[in-house]
């Protein structure tokens, strides 16, 4: 007996996504990032409450609202990761973007690992910081090897240099596209966190005391 046979709605085993047969029956399951609803047949249509983390040679995802307390985080199936560093996610397109300092590239893929591609690779050395502007669909990044902050469209085109003067080892970067500001850290001899317009203008220091290695920063919108 085929417990995952298609029904009248063309659903295998009555499951909206994955049907997993077992010895006595079958179990419905969901792709990475989606949650099985109470009917035990239907998956949510969009991911919700996710934690996405980079661990050098893999990128993992965990559902924070999972009904299964024993569920572990899942490895997103990506190829040839060498040293992933910065990571961001676009909820509109369901794509993740990450920098790989081992390969000196900026890459993207869908949350299920499909359509993996490199979007920026020329002229990069150590792209340690990455931020997605979801309003105008731009990528901002820092490069501690070229001492630059740059921007490009999310497909890597229309690339532009924003800040290069008086940068020693720019590290992390976050953006606030609603207000038109970006914030970044710099591991200079006297470390600093600065702000600037998203076009690189109006640059100023906002934190310059009691800093050592300001690796990660975030913003409260």
Q: Where do the model's predicted regions map?
A:
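Residue position within the beta-strands of beta-propeller blades
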Residues: 52-53, 98, 140-141, 183-185
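Beta-rich catalytic cores
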Residues: 15, 83, 102, 126, ...
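Conserved N-terminal segment of EGF-like repeats
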Residues: 1-65, 69-85, 100
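Short coil turn/linker residues within repeat-based beta-strand modules
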Residues: 66-70, 103, 113-115, 146, ...
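Short coil/turn segments that connect the beta-strands within blades of beta-propeller domains
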Residues: 48-49, 92-94, 135-137, 178-180
């Amino acid at each position: 007996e085929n417990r995952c046979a298609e029904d009248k709605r063309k659903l295998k085993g009555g499951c909206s996504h994955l049907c997993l047969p077992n010895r006595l029956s079958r179990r419905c399951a969901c792709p990475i990032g989606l949650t099985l609803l109470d009917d035990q047949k239907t998956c949510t249509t969009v991911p919700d409450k996710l934690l996405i983390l980079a661990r050098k040679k893999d990128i993992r995802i965990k559902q924070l609202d999972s009904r299964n307390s024993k569920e572990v985080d899942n490895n997103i199936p990506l190829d040839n990761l060498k040293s992933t560093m910065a990571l961001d996610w676009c909820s509109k397109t369901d794509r993740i973007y990450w920098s790989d300092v081992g390969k000196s590239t900026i890459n993207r893929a869908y949350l299920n690992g499909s359509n993996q591609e490199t979007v920026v690779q020329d002229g990069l050395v150590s792209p340690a910081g990455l931020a997605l502007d979801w309003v105008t669909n731009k990528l901002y990044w820092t490069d501690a090897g070229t001492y630059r902050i740059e921007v490009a469209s999310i497909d890597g085109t229309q690339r532009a240099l924003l800040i290069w003067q008086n940068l020693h080892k720019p590290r992390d970067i976050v953006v606030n596209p609603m207000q038109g500001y970006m914030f970044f850290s710099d591991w200079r001899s006297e470390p600093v966190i600065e702000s600037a317009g998203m076009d690189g203008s109006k640059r100023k220091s906002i934190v310059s005391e009691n800093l050592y290695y300001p690796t990660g920063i975030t913003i409260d919108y």
